[in-house]
A protein has these predicted regions:
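Gly-rich Lys/Arg/Thr-decorated short loops/hinges at beta-loop-alpha junctions or inter-strand turns
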Residues: 1-3, 110-115, 319-325
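Charged, amphipathic alpha-helical linker segments immediately N-terminal to NTP-binding catalytic cores
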Residues: 79-141
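Catalytic cores of large soluble enzymes that bind and process phosphate-bearing ligands
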Residues: 6-14, 119-127, 327-334
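Glycine-rich, often acidic-flanked micro-motifs
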Residues: 140, 148-150, 154-165, 175-179, ...
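Short alpha-helical segments and helix-capping/turn motifs at coil-helix boundaries
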Residues: 15-24, 68-72, 102-103, 251-263, ...
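Conserved lysine of the Walker
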Residues: 170
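N-terminal accessory targeting/assembly segments
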Residues: 1-76
Length: 359
């Protein structure tokens, strides 16, 4: 485990107490919802996830973001147990008197038992990133590389990965072309057989959303989708996409099948191109550059970009930052573990690597 400002150790007694507080809160709430779903579209590597929560919108969020099992799979597969459990008691504040707790909210991860507990925050993105972090710990042991990236498939059957922090363009660029099908917009795995999307849905930023520029996202905001951290125009009751009074990190969650140009099941062959999306607001990097293996290794490890409001980093104004692997906050292992795997796969499959500056 790579301990740092994002991965903070806590003693087993405190972790057990935090989990018990969440379980007790859920058990004594008026409503308790349980959502079962798969993470990972490749059936050889998918895992079963079970979420316990008290808010309907959290349940719908996980129903959107996980891969929905069939009735037969629910009966025959999930009845045998699950691989990951999430206890979301986000409405309950946590006491700083518990040893190891440093804030009034906590996301506590028990890797040995694959359980995540959430207290003190109702941000739905915590659940999907909990699954991502657990898989980023276990998948590399199976030689599966986890990437904070979107993935697309073109008409010729070749795939492209776009790695980047939140708000650098992974979702927007992945959905922009009618000639490319979206495989996933945020969490991609690269195996010995090809690539697959971890998620069953999209979690897209909607700040300043324009129907003419991003029609796919706009048209996916309908019955069954979720809009989070947004306000409404008082007269028309339509969404005010330009309001940042709550946070710039306003988002929508919807299942992949809401998109007309999606590749389902969300799997594909080994990528032909990998694009590092860098929102360089200082003008240091060129608009486009092709990288050799050493440059790709350095750029992936340094993760130079700008802080933009998102699930991993939030800021009211852009500022330069470095985030290893374009998602350091999600990495349980040392960044070189993922960087070494990436370069090995790039060399093995003769992949082109590009840097694109979206700043």
């Amino acid at each position: 485990m790579n301990w740092n400002n994002h991965n903070i150790p806590i003693d087993p007694e405190s972790a057990s107490l935090i989990e018990q507080l969440a379980v007790d809160y859920i058990n004594h709430s008026e409503h308790c919802m349980v959502v079962d779903g798969y993470a990972g579209w490749d059936k050889n590597y998918r895992v079963k996830v079970r979420t316990f929560c008290t808010r309907t919108y959290h349940a719908l969020f996980m129903r959107n973001m996980l891969i929905r099992p069939t009735e037969k799979e629910l009966e025959e597969d999930f009845s045998k147990g699950v691989d990951i459990q999430i206890f979301n008691a986000g409405e309950m504040n946590i006491s700083k008197n518990i040893p190891g707790v440093t804030a009034n909210m906590v996301t506590a991860l028990n890797l040995s038992q694959r359980r995540m507990t959430i207290l003190g925050t109702q941000f739905a993105g915590e659940m999907k990133k909990s699954v991502f972090k657990i898989l980023q710990y276990y998948y590399p042991r199976k030689n599966i590389l986890t990437l904070h990236s979107s993935a697309t498939l073109n008409e010729n059957g070749t795939t492209t990965l776009m790695c980047g922090l939140s708000a650098t363009g992974k979702t927007a660029l992945g959905l922009r072309s009618d000639k490319r099908k979206i495989i996933g917009d945020d969490e991609t795995c690269w195996t010995n057989d090809g690539i697959f999307n971890i998620e069953g849905g999209c979690y897209a930023k909607i700040i300043d959303l324009d129907r003419t520029i991003e029609p796919e996202i706009f048209n996916s905001i309908r019955y069954g989708s979720i809009v989070e951290n947004a306000s409404f125009h008082p007269d028309s009751r339509s969404i005010n996409f330009n309001d940042v009074s709550i946070t710039p990190n306003s988002r929508t969650s919807f299942p992949l099948n809401f998109l007309k140009n999606v590749n389902l099941p969300a799997v594909g062959p080994h990528p032909k191109n990998i694009i590092f999306l860098t929102c360089d607001t200082k003008g240091v990097l060129p608009p486009v550059a092709k990288l050799n293996h050493d440059q790709a290794y350095y750029q992936f490890l340094s993760g130079y970009t700008a802080k933009i409001g998102g699930t991993d980093l939030s800021a009211s104004t852009p500022s330069s930052t470095f985030s290893s692997c374009f998602g350091e906050i999600f990495l349980p292992l040392h960044p070189t573990v993922y960087a070494n795997m990436l370069i090995e796969k790039i060399k093995k499959h003769n992949v082109n690597v590009w840097l694109v500056n979206t700043g």
